[in-house]
Design a protein with these regions (language model features):
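Acidic, glycine-anchored pre-beta loop/turn
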Residues: 119-128
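Substrate-binding clefts and substrate-entry loops adjacent to catalytic sites
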Residues: 574-600, 618-637, 648
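Surface-exposed, glycine-biased beta-strand/turn segments
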Residues: 1-88, 93-101, 129-130, 137-139, ...
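Cell-wall glycan-active module
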Residues: 1-34, 103, 119-120, 150-515, ...
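Extracytoplasmic
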Residues: 42-44, 58, 87, 107, ...
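Active-site loop architecture of trypsin-fold serine endopeptidases
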Residues: 137-147, 151
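Conserved positions in beta-strands of structured domains
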Residues: 62-64, 113-116
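Substrate-binding/active-site groove segments that recognize
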Residues: 464-468, 472-473, 561-580
Length: 685
């Protein structure tokens, strides 16, 4: 899922992404979410702007309803009710993916109301792509602003949040088909907290112990090499509020904790490093079809804050529950609100009216869509009766004026069912899903460059990579003319699972990864190193390359040719990957035909690439000795930036000779980076 705000301006260095989203969406406090100042439901927010501000599409989607503005009408009734008001709008339906399987496929809608003008490309049935212009901000009640909202139906609220209940179910772990963002842990009262880490990651801990007296909620997040642990507890009086315990702990259990997850997995989980990597990354094993933790109850010891001070806890203990941002944990503010049973526009929700929290932006509220002309009269009927909002009830003529104004703004030929929908604060929805990082089919299509080479030849210009061909490549097995498998089936989901596991989830990291894959796989065409039999002689025992790769048996050159999303090459690398996956059988991938798995099995093909990415260390010569330079893993180098030199440095971690950098890797990176970032001016290529 790729998403951004409807207003786009440059990021500021060191600015948090959520802060940038809020800066892009300056909200009128009188027209906020989920209520306006008159205590009526308000399904979106009014974004303050100016008449020259371009409103942009937040994500790829299809235009399903539109109304052109009429400047001559906005100064007179019924549009001019409290001031000049524009009636132009665009309604977009977004179909995207946030995880694997059917539960990972979601539908939501975005509405851009009170537009002064609408871009000529915006037509019913047309597809709009993220960052494309929708139109220009107009006027609302005499103020420069436009209304913006995001909502979904009943079926999709369960897919999006994983539940229909107000709060997270604390009796079971969170979803495994939709996992993204931070990891969260529920520690019931009575959880043992120890004074020190046990030796060798032992399940037994003989250091002093005390037990928690109240439930605790721990969040584990990764960012640019750091791992941050935050503990919360429920407020003793304000039951709807969860307060932080102590200050966030950053890298309390090791320097550059995120970058070093691979080395920690080898150290702490010597019998199953790959599954151990998932424990460190997710707090649990997620890919259970291919990963098995040994022993099954291997612990996850982490330092956290408690009301009594810092302590060490086994977050892998049986009684502790594990979730991700994909479960919308209620202790981080997310709550489903569905307790206003009437059908009028007045907010009568006890949850909203009686809450003790000041911030309602993570309330997901179920109430009628305010733009349905068929329900306008019934939604505003309450204004004729005594109420707490108006000093006296509205007269029939006054109410008629309001109703005519509302009808003039309602959707034309409303394509949506006349029922309640689930409303999100659009700032929170966008900020939340910018942490998702899951690439669906259409996302992969967008991120892959149409042309392989920076300067394509005539043959490629006339036959660029088509959408249908790319879909076939990420779904179906591929074979060469000799019947040899060159590409596994089922790459789409397994690639996103691998990117998620190895924390290749930020736009910059994903762009660098796809830049490398463009050369390594020919844009998903072949996941095996190309060449005739004589080509691989340069990798044979006794050659310079063969010695570097640990090839010591005749035939190793072809036997251990490059395979995977990022090519695993050479006997030593195949053996090391085997040690990482299953140390009890470290020759698994060096034994034929298992050496073929990184090209025949989509999971191993993608996982081998992720393993290579996470385990790669740069070395330099210092005083005639090879010395590590920089942190472990390619993510460290990817985080450096998006310049030509940054991309070249990443490339040298994958291919020391930087093969194909200028012609393929760099233009592929530039393309992917533009698709994923928030710039509105594309690169020249």
């Amino acid at each position: 899922m790729i998403i951004s705000p409807p207003i786009l301006h440059a990021h500021i260095d060191t600015e948090k992404d959520s802060d940038w989203v809020n800066r892009m969406m300056s909200v009128d406090p009188e027209r906020n979410f989920p209520m306006n100042s008159g205590r009526s439901w308000h399904g979106g927010v009014h974004l303050n702007g100016n008449l020259s501000e371009t409103v942009r599409c937040i994500a790829d989607g299809k235009v399903i309803s539109i109304r052109q503005p009429e400047p001559a009408e906005n100064t007179v009734p019924p549009l001019n009710y409290n001031g000049v008001t524009d009636k132009g709008y665009v309604l977009i339906k977004h179909e995207t993916e946030i995880g694997s399987g059917e539960e990972g496929k979601i539908v939501y809608y975005s509405l851009y109301m009170h537009l002064r003008s609408i871009d000529s490309n915006v037509q019913p049935g047309n597809t709009l792509y993220r960052k494309e212009p929708v139109g220009a901000a107009g006027m609302v009640d005499g103020q420069n602003a436009f209304h913006f909202q995001i909502f979904c139906d009943d079926e999709n609220i369960q897919k999006i949040t994983g539940r229909i209940s107000p709060e997270t179910d604390l009796n079971k772990d969170g979803r495994t088909d939709v996992v993204y963002g931070d990891s969260h842990f529920y520690l019931p009262a009575g959880t043992p907290i120890y004074g020190d880490m046990p030796e060798e990651n032992s399940l037994a801990n003989n250091s002093p112990v005390q037990r928690t007296s109240v439930p605790l909620y721990v969040t584990m997040s990764f960012d640019k090499g750091n791992c941050t642990m935050v503990t919360r507890q429920q407020h003793e009086v304000l039951s709807d509020t969860y307060t932080e315990v102590g200050s966030p702990l950053i890298n309390a259990d090791g320097k550059d904790y995120e970058y070093n997850l691979y080395s920690y997995a080898l150290q702490l989980y010597p019998k199953s490093p790959s599954a151990g990597y998932e424990m460190l990354r997710f707090g649990r094993v997620v890919n259970t079809e291919y990963e098995e933790l040994v022993p099954a109850d291997a612990p996850l010891w982490r330092t956290i804050n408690t009301p009594q001070g810092k302590g060490v806890v086994n977050l892998g203990a049986r009684d502790i529950r594990v979730y991700s941002d994909g479960d919308f944990p209620h202790w981080t503010g997310w709550k489903l609100v569905n307790d206003d049973a009437d059908t009028n526009s007045q907010c009568n929700s006890p949850t909203i009216l009686c809450t003790t929290r000041n911030d309602l932006s993570r309330m997901i509220c179920h109430f009628p869509l305010e733009w349905d002309s068929a329900t306008v009269e019934s939604r505003f009927e309450w204004l004729k009766s005594p109420n707490d909002v108006l000093s006296k009830p509205m007269t029939e003529p006054d109410l008629d004026l309001l109703i005519e104004h509302c009808k003039a703004l309602c959707l034309v030929d409303n394509p949506l069912p006349a029922r309640r929908v689930w409303h999100f604060d659009p700032r929170q929805f966008i900020a939340h899903f910018r942490k998702c990082g899951w690439l669906g089919e259409n996302d992969i299509i967008s991120v892959v460059r149409r042309y392989q080479n920076a300067y394509p030849m005539t043959s490629e210009l006339t036959r660029p990579l088509s959408k249908d061909t790319l879909i076939e490549r990420i779904i179906s097995q591929g074979q060469n003319s000799s019947g040899e498998v060159i590409r596994p089936a089922g790459l789409k989901n397994e690639l996103s699972k691998s990117l998620r596991k190895y924390l290749i989830t930020t736009p910059l990291r994903i762009a660098h990864y796809f830049g490398q894959m463009a050369r390594e796989t020919g844009r998903f065409a072949s996941f095996i190193e190309n060449g005739d039999s004589s080509y691989f002689d340069m990798y044979e025992p006794g050659t310079e390359q063969g010695l570097k790769l640990g090839n010591n048996v005749v035939g190793d050159g072809a036997r251990f040719k490059g395979r995977g999303t990022i090519h695993l090459t050479g006997r030593e690398n195949y053996r090391n990957y085997g040690k990482y996956r299953n140390p009890s059988d470290d020759d698994f991938f060096t034994t034929e035909p298992n050496n073929q798995l990184p090209v025949e099995n989509a999971y191993f093909s993608c996982d081998a690439g992720g393993y290579f990415w996470a385990s790669k260390q740069k070395y330099i010569i210092v005083s005639h000795r090879l010395t590590p330079s920089g942190s472990l893993g390619v993510n460290y180098w990817a985080d450096k930036g998006c310049s030509l030199s940054d991309a070249r440095e990443v490339t040298r971690r994958i291919n020391p000779a930087a093969d194909g950098f200028d012609l393929v890797r760099w233009p592929a990176f530039e393309h992917s980076w533009y698709v994923l970032n928030d710039e509105i001016t594309p690169p020249l290529n």
